[in-house]
Regions:
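Bacterial N-terminal signal peptides that target proteins for export
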Residues: 1-9
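Bacterial N-terminal signal peptides
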Residues: 10-18
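Catalytic-loop region of hydrolases
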Residues: 24-97
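Short beta-strand element of the alpha/beta-hydrolase
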Residues: 79, 93-112, 116
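Cap/lid segment of the alpha/beta-hydrolase catalytic domain
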Residues: 106-168, 207-209
Length: 342
């Protein structure tokens, strides 16, 4: 990756890290000992039609597919698989067909919370179509996996979703697609992994760690298919990956802004993830911590020896000023201008 791209990612990290400070409640789910087949059953589907904003999609839905033999939690270790109905009539969509269509692989993870498999519908605004709907309308096959998260517990109170559970689950879902590639629509050699924030981080990790042996032990434990877990493309929005340094970056960027509006992520009694906003003012101790974290960031940033597209070294002085700050500012201004021009 070029250095200027690293800069863009770093800026995204500092903007997105606030999500990780959200309060949470734990969910308790039962551990299952039932063994499942990981052979794709093409007979279990429903043909569905959905219209949003005047666009209609007809698709075949294979839902709640358990993608491992020995799941820890079948509420999350499942996948929904959607295929444009046109492919079963020998037709093409957007130049793709039943055999070569890319597989859009969007996870629903946010805040490293557990996530159920997604479905086509409206986005959070309740008006516009979500990414799964759009992908199907463009001829993509969609495989939306669920995954365990940091608050998931079994009936005995044991946490079953702590790291590396989420990435292991997503890898297992990818392996399912490769394992069944000959009998499933779409091409497992053209998987496009997608996610936002923590989901973006997991998507990035999928792309960077394809077929890495470090995960074999965990994949074997849950009965993942003996197949590749590599993806072709990663689509990651504000991926929060650099966790050990993200707080410093965040406070460097927002230090001095002491009124806040933060996102609180909780889980209701029916296990649905709920997101609400909380407003307030920072305490004296919080302001002190912010100042200390901001002061730590320049040393870390300078140690990276990052460069812009012209080869200029980007750095900060002890006060947090310098051409790196100007570099980040230019991206923020350009982004704001683009939004204003729409």
């Amino acid at each position: 990756m070029k250095n200027w791209k690293k800069m863009a990612i770093l800026a995204c990290l500092s903007l997105s890290v606030g999500v990780l400070h959200a309060g949470t409640t734990t969910s308790t789910t039962s551990t299952t000992k039932k063994s499942y087949s990981i052979d794709f059953d093409s007979s279990k589907y429903t043909v569905k039609t959905l219209t949003i904003n005047g666009v209609t999609i007809n698709y075949r839905a294979y839902e709640q597919i358990v993608y491992v033999k020995n799941p820890i939690d079948t509420k999350y270790e499942t996948m929904n698989f959607f295929v444009p109905e046109a492919y079963f009539k020998g037709e093409s969509v957007n130049g793709y067909n039943n055999y070569d269509a890319p597989i859009f692989f969007p996870n629903q993870v946010g805040g490293y919370m557990p996530a159920e498999a997604g479905s086509p519908g409206t986005s959070r605004d309740g008006v516009n179509p979500n990414a799964i709907f759009v992908a199907l309308s463009k001829g993509y096959v969609v495989a939306s996996p669920g995954a365990r998260g940091r608050v998931t517990k079994n009936a005995n109170g044991l946490y079953t979703g702590k790291a590396p559970a989420a990435i292991v689950d997503l890898k297992a879902a990818v392996r399912y697609l490769h394992y069944n590639d000959k009998v499933m629509p779409g091409s497992a050699n053209r998987i496009v992994s997608n996610g936002t924030s923590a989901g973006g981080a997991l998507s990035s990790l999928l792309g960077a760690s394809g077929n890495n042996k470090d995960y074999d032990k965990y994949l074997k434990e849950i009965g993942a298919a003996n197949a590749s877990d590599a993806v072709l493309v990663v689509s990651a929005y504000c991926p929060i990956t650099n966790l050990e340094n993200a707080d410093m970056a965040y406070e460097w960027l927002f230090n001095g802004i002491n009124e806040y509006k933060s996102l609180k992520i909780t889980q209701s009694t029916d296990f649905k993830v709920e997101r609400t906003y909380v407003t307030g003012s920072m305490t004296e101790d919080q302001i002190k911590a912010s100042n200390e974290l901001k002061a730590m960031f320049p040393k870390y940033l300078n140690s990276l020896k990052l460069k812009d597209k012209k080869g200029n070294v980007l750095s900060l002085d002890s006060d947090g000023n310098g051409n790196f700050k100007d570099f980040v500012k230019s991206y923020i201004i350009a982004s704001a201008q683009k939004a204003m021009d729409k």
